[in-house]
Regions:
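Binuclear metal-dependent hydrolase catalytic cores
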Residues: 1-183, 194, 199, 261-285
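Active-site flanking residues adjacent to catalytic metal/cofactor-binding acidic residues
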Residues: 45, 80, 185-186, 211-212, ...
Length: 285
């Protein structure tokens, strides 16, 4: 029996802030946004500046389906946390303005009541933004959870969650579909020589591990308390967890294409099936 299609596409791979310069064009300057297609299901991870272009594409697809008399499936939008580089695209996500679409928004990093809804309202209000989420026309369901929960956003997709080591809390995800999996582990730090057991557990034997490679090991002592990790630590974790493929993510905004190419080459010398994430990169699982 043939497997159902499962693929990952990167719409933004930069961390901290967007970077639009001639020497970052190849890997792209948009911040965190990753699309996962599990058969007909669409799961989106993080709402950085890359979300805008993805949203435009999803609305075009929905219109084509409706023209054929078909109803688009609900979209699922997962947040790791709500630092600006992971939510800057939120007000500009075109599906929110399509009354024929429904979006489920998931988060597990905040505390208190109505966590996900509160995040939307606090971000989209004056003086930071002129209008609130009440302008959205789509159906919007807010889904709160605690890290450690296993979620079922679609009938045949499960999403495992863990808490990561980052300021203001952060969530890591493992998406399981049709006997395969992808782990999205960004915005986390590490203690040198002490692999994170939670990450090793959730990434065990995964088909693809996406990991926070903001820094190099040589840079890390200067930035150890910034809440980010290194691409080399990602290699060590991928090897220890038995991951089949590895993708470096959350690149420094100042990291040039030339520097990223060098990192990618060095990474492949240690872990053959690896990439540095770039906008437009599609990985079939």
């Amino acid at each position: 029996m043939s497997q159902k299609p499962f693929k990952v596409r990167f719409w933004g791979a930069r961390g901290t802030m967007a970077s639009s310069t001639p020497d970052t064009n190849h890997y792209g300057g948009n911040t965190a946004c990753v699309e996962m297609r599990c058969g007909e299901h669409v799961l989106v991870f993080d709402a950085g500046s890359g979300l805008r272009m993805l949203g435009d594409k999803l609305v075009r697809e929905a219109k084509r389906l409706r023209n054929k008399g078909q109803t688009p499936e609900p979209l699922n939008l997962f947040f790791t946390h709500c630092h600006y580089d992971h939510i800057s695209g939120l007000p500009f996500f075109a599906p929110f303005f399509d009354p024929g679409l429904h979006v489920q928004a998931w988060s597990g990093h905040l505390v208190g009541e109505n966590k996900t809804q509160r995040m939307f309202r606090e971000y989209m209000k004056p003086p930071f933004f002129p209008v609130g989420p009440e302008i959205f026309a789509a159906g919007l369901t807010y889904k709160d959870f605690e890290p450690g929960a296993t979620l079922t956003p679609c009938p045949d997709v499960t999403v495992e969650t863990i808490e990561l080591q980052h300021h203001d809390r952060c969530v890591g995800y493992r998406v399981n579909f049709d006997g395969r999996s992808v782990c999205y582990i960004t915005d986390t730090t590490h203690i040198p020589g002490e692999p994170d057991e939670n990450i090793l557990r959730i990434c065990q034997d995964t088909d693809l591990m996406i990991y926070d490679g903001t820094y190099t090991d040589a840079e890390f002592p200067q930035f150890w308390n910034f809440g980010h990790s290194t691409w080399e630590e990602g290699v060590r974790l991928a090897q220890a967890a038995g991951a089949k493929r590895y993708c470096i993510f959350h690149h420094r905004p100042s990291r040039s294409d030339k520097a990223m190419e060098k990192i990618e080459q060095e990474c492949r010398a240690l872990f053959r099936r690896s990439w540095a994430a770039r906008e437009g990169l599609v990985i079939k699982i």
